[in-house]
């Protein structure tokens, strides 16, 4: 017969330290805490990594313009600190690590991209400002698509403007506005990343991307029933900012053996019509009595803006080709002073008044509206 006392003595005491079960309460709690603690993300401190990797405290491989993690997650990659001395300079081409739409995005459709490229080549290119001239039309329909194949920002800008044009031609096709917005957002984001490192290979494409973005934003403003002054001033800043981009690109390619494709656009740029400050039929937009709020510099800025509106209106009345008038309309920010834009952003009444007249005056032209849509 089994001795019950011997059996009991053979069972280890629950308080014994010879078994994992024998730990006291504090040791067990410590053990459980260690067990529950999640894996720690490996990282090293980086002063020049992108914003997102620094915020997450993970190692950034500092690939430019888009690091590995941001590319994997399909999110914008922002470098807000200059690279350390001796660091590898950032790549200027976006194609090495492209920012692509997510698989669920409606624009991530090869068939749609082919359709947009086809539409741009055959139809949208013919509506570009200045396309009444054969060399300008050929530039938009032949040279620009070719450049876009090796420069993602330009390719996405082409898709965006084609989708916008298609949405005007086929207003019942519901998905086009979203596709347009998606490609426009990608083009803007990528363009900002690339303009800091223009090369002889990308100079042409950078300039054409800048023009397409200006046309797209302007056409979008035209199609809105209500346009805020903030949107107008943003468009004006975008147009004026493009001058610095063009200057940088032209400086880089000026020693090239062959002239850049963008030169045909620059060469046909409409000259200012205004030779004086004649406001003509728009003189009612100017102050008749002095105002303590505005000094002589501000008054001159108002006169210049109104004189340009009047001069362009007279050119339209004289049957200037609608495509030329269209270009004048879109480069209005280049023909006014920076001071006028500052006054507009400060919401000075006399700066606010000319802008609606500028849009209304040309909005009445059906041909112009078609060419900028």
Swiss-Prot record:
The keyword Phosphoprotein does not apply. GO terms for cellular component: nucleus. Residues 50-77 bind DNA. PANTHER family: STEROL REGULATORY ELEMENT-BINDING PROTEIN ECM22, ZN(2)-C6 FUNGAL-TYPE DOMAIN-CONTAINING PROTEIN. It is found in: Nucleus. Its main location: nucleus. The keyword Transcription applies. Keywords: DNA-binding, Metal-binding, Nucleus, Transcription, Transcription regulation. Gene3D superfamilies: Zn(2)-C6 fungal-type DNA-binding domain (4.10.240.10). Zn(2)-C6 fungal-type transcription factor; part of the gene cluster that mediates the biosynthesis fumihopaside A, a hopane-type glucoside that enhances the thermotolerance and UV resistance of N.fumigata. GO terms for molecular function: DNA binding; DNA-binding transcription factor activity, RNA polymerase II-specific; zinc ion binding. Residues 33-48 have a biased composition (Basic residues). It holds the Pfam family Fungal_trans_2. This is Zn(2)-C6 fungal-type transcription factor afumD. It comes from Aspergillus fumigatus (strain CBS 144.89 / FGSC A1163 / CEA10). InterPro entries: Fun_TF (IPR021858), Zn2-C6_fun-type_DNA-bd_sf (IPR036864), Zn2-C6_fungal_TF (IPR052400), Zn2Cys6_DnaBD (IPR001138). Residues 1-48, 86-110 are annotated as: Disordered.
